Design a protein with these regions (language model features):
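A beta-strand edge to alpha-helix "cap/lid" segment located at domain peripheries
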Residues: 2-15, 69-144
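Short, low-complexity N-terminal intrinsically disordered segments enriched in polar/charged residues
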Residues: 1-38, 42, 46
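Short, hydrophobic secondary-structure boundary micro-motifs
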Residues: 45, 55-56, 84-85
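Generic alpha-helical structural signal
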Residues: 26, 30, 66-69, 73
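Selective for proline/serine-rich intrinsically disordered segments
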Residues: 7, 25, 54-55, 81
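Hydrophobic pocket/interface hotspot
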Residues: 32, 44-45, 52, 64, ...
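A short gly/proline-enriched turn/hairpin at secondary-structure junctions
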Residues: 15, 53-63, 78
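Short, solvent-exposed secondary-structure junction/capping segments
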Residues: 33-37, 48-60
Length: 144
């Protein structure tokens, strides 16, 4: 699978929704959730910089658009992301950190999640860390 160079993070897709996240109006973050929920993983990966990374729970970071698209295609099918609210913070070098909390629903379970995005000055995703917001007991019950 290769990521088309002409996929722009701002391209509108047929699956564009009226997604809103309280406290967040950053288009690239909104597109991340829209494209993930639409199963458009190559388009999601195109939102990342060339050396961008995504770090799923309990895993090492996955680097690069193609690797991210392949990972999402294998692991994210059927997930429904429901971001609720977030906060944005300006950092040095014109970077922005955005934290969003919400829920991920799979066919088997739902879990509260935090997404932490680091955006470049060019509004590309440099890094996304996904954290489960569950107690150890809740995590153990997911295995049953």
């Amino acid at each position: 699978m290769s990521i088309a160079n002409d996929i722009s993070p701002t391209n509108e897709s047929a699956a564009t929704t009226d997604l809103t996240i309280e406290g967040i109006d950053e288009p690239v973050v909104l597109r991340y959730f829209e494209t993930m929920n639409a199963g458009e993983y190559e388009t999601t990966a195109a939102l990342f910089g060339d050396t961008g990374t995504i770090q799923p729970p309990f895993e090492q970071p996955i680097e690069g658009k193609e690797a991210i698209a392949n990972y999402l295609e294998a692991e994210a099918k059927g997930m429904q992301l429901s971001p609720k609210e977030g906060i944005a913070e300006s950092l040095d070098n014109d970077q922005t950190q955005i934290q969003v909390i919400g829920k991920v629903q799979t066919s088997l379970f739902g879990v509260n999640v935090s997404w932490i995005f680091l955006l470049s000055a060019e509004r590309e995703i440099l890094h996304t860390r996904i954290k489960l917001l569950a107690s150890p007991q809740e995590l153990l019950s997911l295995r049953r």
